[in-house]
Amino acid sequence: MDSINQVLKLGLPKGSLQDSTIDLFAQAGFHFSVQSRSYFPSIDDDELEAILIRAQEMAHYVELGAFDVGLTGKDWIIETDADVVEVADLVYSKASMRPVRWVLCVPESSTVRSVKDLEGKHIATEVVNITRKYLAKNGVNAMVEFSWGATEVKPPDLADAIVEVTETGSSLRANKLRIVDTILESNTKLIANKASWNDPWKREKIENMAMLLLGAINAQGKVGLKMNAPKSAIDKILAIIPALRQPTISSLAEEQWVALEVIVSEKTVRKLIPELKRAGAEGIFEYNINKLID
């Protein structure tokens, strides 16, 4: 289908994931400009329209068709029981490249040691449905109350326990809370409306976006190295390189020399480059990688 006048409506998560999501899209090649107090970012792609909305509501609006595609957590898809297409797992969060956890917490001084100890107790959380399913699975009858935020401050006066999301655990420790159990691990997902997914033009646009976003995630923490080396040093150099993939070796005009190119973890480079130099490599060149497509 001709793409003239076609637009893909994209929902971006507002709040804690906003900055890391905008940065990820930039690395993938989509550059947004977000003005202060505006919910409508501009983008350097005439076939995209973007709106900022809370991740908690994203799956619901994607299901309704208000957005063709959006980014939200696995947790909110489950919590809202949204019927959407889960296009891709994008494992990143506001502070790291790893999943977040929804955990059952109590005050450090609490006698609660397992979920069974919460029979008849009061639990505060943003994920009421997820928590109720967890309690039912464990045969526990407790009161679950929706929390509008600042959930960590509620125990012990306003709740006996909470179910809260954590990435590093620092906020829980700061509020003297102890983790009793992990209820759910969650990561960001690219999701699509079912009707949009069945539209050939929109599906191709969404699949291309997913490929580039996954490529950007895959490239994080990696760099490329190029170098020249005499053929006599190849075996020694290959033994040094902790390659994520087999190096590319190309012939040079000078018959006894080759060019090597390899992708490595950025953490290894400061140790690796001097070793490569001592092994006989010359003209070593390090470069950043924005996307790494498998």
UniProtKB/Swiss-Prot annotation:
Pathway: Amino-acid biosynthesis; L-histidine biosynthesis; L-histidine from 5-phospho-alpha-D-ribose 1-diphosphate: step 1/9. The keyword Iron-sulfur does not apply. It is found in: Cytoplasm. Its cofactor is Mg(2+). It holds the Pfam family HisG. SUPFAM superfamilies: GlnB-like, Periplasmic binding protein-like II. Gene3D superfamilies: 3.30.70.120, Periplasmic binding protein-like II (3.40.190.10). GO terms for cellular component: cytoplasm. Its main location: cytoplasm. Keywords: Amino-acid biosynthesis, ATP-binding, Cytoplasm, Glycosyltransferase, Histidine biosynthesis, Magnesium, Metal-binding, Nucleotide-binding, Transferase. Its EC number is 2.4.2.17. GO terms for biological process: L-histidine biosynthetic process. The keyword Cytoplasm applies. It is an enzyme of class 2 (transferase). It catalyses: 1-(5-phospho-beta-D-ribosyl)-ATP + diphosphate = 5-phospho-alpha-D-ribose 1-diphosphate + ATP. GO terms for molecular function: ATP binding; ATP phosphoribosyltransferase activity; magnesium ion binding. Coiled coil: none annotated. Feedback inhibited by histidine. It comes from the Bacteria. Catalyzes the condensation of ATP and 5-phosphoribose 1-diphosphate to form N'-(5'-phosphoribosyl)-ATP (PR-ATP). Has a crucial role in the pathway because the rate of histidine biosynthesis seems to be controlled primarily by regulation of HisG enzymatic activity. Belongs to the ATP phosphoribosyltransferase family. Long subfamily. This is ATP phosphoribosyltransferase. It comes from Pelodictyon phaeoclathratiforme (strain DSM 5477 / BU-1). The gene is hisG.
